[in-house]
Amino acid sequence: MNQNFTDHVAEAIQAAFAEAQRLNHTEVTENHLLWAFLKDKEGYFYSLLNGLGTNPQKLFQETENNIHHLPTYSGGGQAPNPSRSLQSRIVDAQNIAQSWKDTYTSSDHFLISYWKNGGDPFASWKKKTTISLEKLEEQIKKIRGDRHMDSPSSESNLQALEKYCKNLTDLARQGKLDPVIGRDEEIRRTMQVLCRRTKNNPMLIGDPGVGKTAIAEGLAQRIVQQDIPDSLKNKQLLALDMGSLIAGTKYRGEFEERLKGILQDIEKSEGQIILFIDEVHTLIGAGATDGAMDAANLLKPALARGILHCIGATTLNEYQKYIEKDAALERRFQLVLVNEPTIEDSIAILRGLRERYEIYHGVHITESAIHAAVLLSSRYITDRRLPDKAIDLIDESASLIRMQLGSRPLPIDNKERELAGLIVEQEAMKRESTPLAKNEVEKLEGRIAQIKEELKILREQWDQEKKIIESLKEKKDKLEKLRFEEEAAERKADYNRVAELRYNLIPQLQKEIEEAQTQLNNKPNRLLQEEVDESLIAQIVSKWTGIPVHKMLEGEAERLLHLENELEKRVVGQEIAVSAVSEAIRRSRSGLSDPNRPMGVFLFLGPTGVGKTELAKALAFQLFNQDEALIRLDMSEYMEKHTVSKLIGSPPGYIGYEEGGQLTEALRRRPYAVVLFDEIEKAHPDVFNILLQVFDDGRLTDSKGRVVNCKNALFIMTSNIGSDLLLEKMEQNKQGLAKDEIMLVLDPVIKKHFRPEFINRLDDILPFVPLREHDMEKIVVIQLNLLAKRLKDRDVELMWTPQALAHLAKEGYDPHFGARPLKRYIQQEVINQLSTAILEGKIPPHSHIKLELEGNTIRFKSFAGGKN
């Protein structure tokens, strides 16, 4: 027997033998083979019968019935032999293949053989159809074209466009594509390139998420609506699926054959097909194994001759990396730049998509949610592009509401938990026989009955609200279908149906939706929330970015107005610095500062221990509600030239290149942060060169060429240069100095240490004055409050007398070293005593401790269980 079968036929024969053996049949008949052909619903045999308008599924069932009634044998393990009917069927199919000048016998040869002289059940099934042999052969020739079965995989490459492409025009006709809002200029430019005589292949280039694929979908929708030039009318726009094209290509040459099949089908269409290739850079190297040609080289001749109309889409980085290197491929495409839409355009895009997301999730998306999604994503999610990031926010917020709609409302959940607890308590009380227990049982019964009644009312309300929401979802779904039907009727010029839909059915349904929405909104104390609003959008943004939700909405203005008060709770005696920093943050948040510069750039100058680093920490907490928002870089680590590259990452070829820079990576992950350069005077001069572009343009390029946005960060540098001069001046003037007087002292030192271009880029140089004696008591209170907080975790309350407070402030004061000696003094005099007493068991839980001054020593008194 000639073994030249296509892969599909070989697989069918194997499946027929395997099924016969499984059923313990003595031989493999032609019906086993027919069963194997029909079992593969994606196969060529099945699709041929389907394309003729017959019912191949019914034939499959009849064939399966037939083979299950064949005689079996009891002995296992014996391989069945091919029957005479199967052998003659194979020979007949091979003769047909030979007469058609095909090298390989394929499924269609077997189908013709069955059609000519197949036995039951095929023969009886064929009689019920009205299909002639001539019609079958015509259908085969239509699918095949001028192709012959000249390789084992030839059958797989028939109808290649249907297998490896997605028809965007069909999807647009069925209303399955999202509406494309705006982008008229880009779609017009794409059509302009497609209408050219040569190089009529547009290449859509833009950042990820700006809507390149949407432009192709918009073009498909315009083709369906006939809103295009005459030369593009009735064209088919197909999207190539590279994944399915490559998948399963085990042997060399299979991939090329599939691609050749696609190109032949496109050539056969005589210019009626436009191919859209998303992520077009994947063509470079695709399918190239052991010296085989890649997809790009196979496409070049078709692109050059104008056989293939192609729209490519890729990002600028990938275009430069892959396509620009291949000059022959590059010149066959014409670039169409797709820029990120503006805030206004993004809002319009989201308005257009709102109804689709409302219908899908069964929720209501407010106008404020759309504005919040665009504005908050634009401001806080800096590493992604509009409109993609704003659409994702709306989608995730709507899915959260939908998830909540499907679960029990909190009031019902709380009541059910309370009821379960009371029932357990009642059962326990029933075991007691005392009069008090009986009285308690009666009380519990009354409370249980009351909660059951409340639960009944709540469940009824929940059911009603669920029904209204489900009804709204169904009505909105129906409205979308009616609108789609209206468009289809208008295209077919069925104006009677258009009038009925436009002036009767659609307005009536819209009125029903409005009434249901009003009924839902007017319900008092609603259990279910089906509205996506700005607060929910802000909540999702906070989950993505880690920036607290309440820091983004109305409360922010109130908080910024009182920023000084909050900062002074942690930083004492530095009114000048606190005020200047607060003003800079208010300027930035109100939108009046330069949008292309960081939020603020400050140099804090002053002696050690006066609150420079503490103010940076306090700012991080106030602005972002967490101390983790402080990116702290100790400049003593960047004193040598070779360490400077750690800020932006090692250059290519050096160890650490893949890891990125310590500053750039931290800012990429957390663009909203306070960046603290501690002891900046110790940094190598090259560090200042890097910081110049950051302070001036709010951007920093890392070693990989990625631009990091620094516009939302607050940069603080600390230094103690000139602090000895400042201390001398303060000792001479006990009343304190104004900022101008302090700067007169520090100016010469600053100019000596820092270059003019660096000083010129600072928003302000803020002097921190040495702490005065009267500041120390406030710092003692802050330190003791922190200690009290730690003791409260052990259920111990701490108090102190004014005398103890004054003594700690006096003894811990050192103008040269700031607040740090005070912290050490409290540790020695107070914390050491308390820790020893706790370990000895002298301070049990629920104690109250009072710090008192005895002579010149701090002592504590412990009052267990109550205050003194």
UniProtKB/Swiss-Prot annotation:
Annotated coiled-coil positions are 391-525
Signal peptide extent: none
Question: Which residues span the membrane?
Answer: none
Give the residues the record marks as binding ATP 1: G206, D207, P208, G209, V210, G211, K212, T213
Which stretches does the entry tag as region NBD2? 556-770
Q: Which Pfam families match?
A: AAA, AAA_2, AAA_lid_9, Clp_N, ClpB_D2-small
Region listing for Repeat 1, in residue ranges: 5-70
Could you confirm whether the keyword Lipid metabolism appears in this record?
A: no
A GO CC term assigned to this protein in UniProt: cytoplasm
Q: Where does ATP 2 bind?
A: G606, P607, T608, G609, V610, G611, K612, T613
Q: Which PROSITE patterns match?
A: CLP_R (PS51903), CLPAB_1 (PS00870), CLPAB_2 (PS00871)
Q: According to its record, what is known about the domains?
A: The Clp repeat (R) domain probably functions as a substrate-discriminating domain, recruiting aggregated proteins to the ClpB hexamer and/or stabilizing bound proteins. The NBD2 domain is responsible for oligomerization, whereas the NBD1 domain stabilizes the hexamer probably in an ATP-dependent manner. The movement of the coiled-coil domain is essential for ClpB ability to rescue proteins from an aggregated state, probably by pulling apart large aggregated proteins, which are bound between the coiled-coils motifs of adjacent ClpB subunits in the functional hexamer.
> What binding partners and quaternary form does the record give?
Homohexamer. The oligomerization is ATP-dependent.
Which PANTHER family does the entry mention?
Answer: ATP-DEPENDENT CLP PROTEASE, HEAT SHOCK PROTEIN 104
The record's comment on protein family reads:
Belongs to the ClpA/ClpB family.
Q: What is this protein called?
A: Chaperone protein ClpB
Q: Which organism is it from?
A: Protochlamydia amoebophila (strain UWE25)
Query: What gene does this protein come from?
Result: clpB
